[in-house]
Amino acid sequence: MSNFKSKYHDELIANAAYIGTPGKGILAADESTGTIGKRLASINVENVETNRRALRELLFTAPNVLQYLSGVILFEETLYQSTAAGKPFVDVLNEAGVLPGIKVDKGTVELAGTDGETTTQGLDGLGARCAKYYEAGARFAKWRAVLKIGPNEPSLSILSIENAYGLARYAVICQENGLVPIVELEILVDGSHDIHKCAAITERVLAATYKALSDHHVLLEGTLLKPNMVTPGSDSPKVAPEVVAEHTVRALQRTVPAAVPAVVFLSGGQSEEEATVNLNAINQVKGKKPWTLSFSFGRALQQSTLKAWSGKEENVKNAQDALLTRAKANSEATLGTYKGNSQLGEGASESLHVKDYKY
């Protein structure tokens, strides 16, 4: 039982439930300056503040798109940016009924004495940052822990002490300052493991994480989970969406408490269409699913939009149309009603996998 007490108790529960509204999901637009630079470089656009702001404005002002979103995760720079006309992005989102969120971790660092295993940085000063972000309009936060599957990893000590407990400390600090914490656990798709290995590791990781959250008295009703879907490794043959769905839902059923209002999947390098089709299959699985099963996609919502835009003002409408197509498709997938799209935008079927992905 959580002993969490805070003036934000009811607000946290309400905001977490709102983000988990069926038919809606999260746009992850919180790429660091370095990561968004790589995205811009792929379309031959310079990584400067004006271009980063232009891309975010394109995303946040796309006609009819925000109706399919309940939240947008921002990078710190973006939280304080405005449209070209001077309207703060936070106001643009709030007026459309979309909650602004904020990335609060400081990236990963390799742990000495391990075979490339990592822990996430950013706990120092987190409380003060969260208070500042809440004041600026953010209502939820994201912290990404990264694990990989290999012959000997993730090790139990790294899993439970470093990453699970780091996530738990982050979560309770966020809640003390009014932010709903997204607990993000990404098991990288890198490797040749089969889907059964991924399922076993995913279950182990989730079980350790919820043990840590309980130990730290985190209010589960005021949290969200952002896990990977259960898939084979990138060097293994793909399996049908129904197989991904079966293994993913079973892993959640075995480990995620019903008190959690929503599970918002990361795309993990899947193509836009693959991520949507798999999400749709997950929502078509019969059986006990006490949480909303939705999306928190970055690359898998933006790839065809980036390709269509290419940094040119005259392409903004086409780029926003591409974003609308993907947002609507993923909204349908959260309801299990997506029928597929015969007219995919450029890049929608392109694998977005990057080995040892840094966000």
UniProtKB/Swiss-Prot annotation:
<feature type="binding site">
    <location>
        <position position="142"/>
    </location>
    <ligand>
        <name>substrate</name>
    </ligand>
</feature>
<keyword id="KW-0963">Cytoplasm</keyword>
<dbReference type="InterPro" id="IPR000741">
    <property type="entry name" value="FBA_I"/>
</dbReference>
<comment type="similarity">
    <text>Belongs to the class I fructose-bisphosphate aldolase family.</text>
</comment>
<dbReference type="GO" id="GO:0004332">
    <property type="term" value="F:fructose-bisphosphate aldolase activity"/>
</dbReference>
<dbReference type="GO" id="GO:0005737">
    <property type="term" value="C:cytoplasm"/>
</dbReference>
<keyword id="KW-0324">Glycolysis</keyword>
<dbReference type="Pfam" id="PF00274">
    <property type="entry name" value="Glycolytic"/>
</dbReference>
<feature type="active site" description="Schiff-base intermediate with dihydroxyacetone-P">
    <location>
        <position position="226"/>
    </location>
</feature>
<dbReference type="InterPro" id="IPR013785">
    <property type="entry name" value="Aldolase_TIM"/>
</dbReference>
<dbReference type="GO" id="GO:0006096">
    <property type="term" value="P:glycolytic process"/>
</dbReference>
<comment type="pathway">
    <text>Carbohydrate degradation; glycolysis; D-glyceraldehyde 3-phosphate and glycerone phosphate from D-glucose: step 4/4.</text>
</comment>
<feature type="site" description="Necessary for preference for fructose 1,6-bisphosphate over fructose 1-phosphate">
    <location>
        <position position="359"/>
    </location>
</feature>
<dbReference type="InterPro" id="IPR029768">
    <property type="entry name" value="Aldolase_I_AS"/>
</dbReference>
<keyword id="KW-0456">Lyase</keyword>
<protein>
    <recommendedName>
        <fullName>Fructose-bisphosphate aldolase, cytoplasmic isozyme</fullName>
        <ecNumber>4.1.2.13</ecNumber>
    </recommendedName>
</protein>
<keyword id="KW-0704">Schiff base</keyword>
<feature type="active site" description="Proton acceptor">
    <location>
        <position position="184"/>
    </location>
</feature>
<feature type="binding site">
    <location>
        <position position="52"/>
    </location>
    <ligand>
        <name>substrate</name>
    </ligand>
</feature>
